[in-house]
């Protein structure tokens, strides 16, 4: 099964390559990710749909995948903590999340057999009330770059964050439903080619 992951995320690429042998990855250009003030579940769905609309469907791939992940502000279910654009922005986000629980939302769209399938899931993560020294270490490491909410659960923040509810894949960028669908599709494509 030949998968095209339309995402610049190294983490997403690594996750798919861990499970599927043939993954090509390309970044989408020009997708507007600014969304009006809606519940985060609707925001990730909207952005994933825009990404799906921008994917050039071709015969070189069997499956196409797009995804969007946002961290919900613990104080406002319609405010997303997206990717910080500076160290100062990352500090602000991590201070907001430190010592608290928050939701992480992912929407994943999978195109196969001539149709898109959308799934949206959330997970709850609790971040320790870590010290200012740890905050400085997290910022200086650059682990916040390109990460929703300014952290990477599978990176340095993994020492200070606990998954309370939901799937780790949801926090890292894909819904579990989509991962299960991809596994089913792989079986289907394997059978059809044998």
Segment roles from a protein language model:
Residues 12, 32-34, 180:
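Flexible, glycine-rich phosphate/dinucleotide-binding loops
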Residues 8, 28, 113:
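Cofactor-binding loop segments of dinucleotide-utilizing enzymes, especially the Rossmann-like FAD-
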Residues 3, 37-194:
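Anionic-ligand binding patches
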Residues 13, 22-24, 68, 124:
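A general secondary-structure boundary signal
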């Amino acid at each position: 099964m030949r998968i095209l992951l339309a995402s610049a995320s190294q983490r997403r690429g690594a996750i798919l390559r861990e499970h599927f042998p043939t993954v090509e990855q390309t970044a989408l250009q020009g997708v507007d990710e600014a969304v009006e003030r809606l519940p985060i579940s609707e925001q990730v769905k909207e952005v994933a749909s825009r990404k799906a609309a921008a994917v050039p469907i071709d015969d070189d791939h069997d499956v196409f995948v797009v995804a969007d992940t946002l961290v919900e502000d613990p104080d406002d279910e319609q405010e997303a903590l997206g990717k910080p654009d500076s160290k100062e922005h990352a500090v602000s986000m991590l201070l907001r999340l430190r010592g608290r629980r928050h939701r992480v939302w992912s929407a994943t769209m999978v195109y196969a057999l001539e149709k898109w399938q959308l799934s949206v899931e959330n997970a709850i993560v609790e971040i320790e009330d870590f010290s200012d020294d740890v905050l400085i270490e997290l910022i200086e490491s650059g682990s916040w770059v390109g990460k929703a909410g300014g952290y990477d659960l599978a990176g340095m923040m993994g020492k200070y964050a606990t998954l309370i509810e939901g799937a780790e894949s949801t926090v890292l960028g894909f819904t579990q439903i989509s991962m299960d669908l991809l596994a089913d599709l792989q079986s289907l494509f394997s059978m059809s080619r044998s």
